[in-house]
Amino acid sequence: MGQVELVRAGINYLSDGGCFTLMTGILARDPIASATVAAFANGAIESFTLAAAIDLPRGIRINTVSPSVLVEATSYHPSFPGYHQVKAVDVADAYVKSIMGKQSGQIYKLD
């Protein structure tokens, strides 16, 4: 759970009112075959985001960006038949919203 450790260690270095933006994916809410551990990890990060938003000190915020499979990640398309594909630029916009906005504890889902 490297992202959790990043937050735990980073609290001491992030400015007051700063923001952590983590990343998960579609597997947290719509898993595929042979991806049980990945689905578990995605769900755990999303739950961590919700809980940490309550406890983070000094106005520090935390959000997670959670896209479906990317249009540009063509090697993954066969594993996600029927899934809506999202553009990388849309994922980037979600990061901007997280970092520049004021919300905390959000899961920005791009399906």
What does each model-found stretch correspond to?
Residues 57-60, 64-111:
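C-terminal helical subdomain
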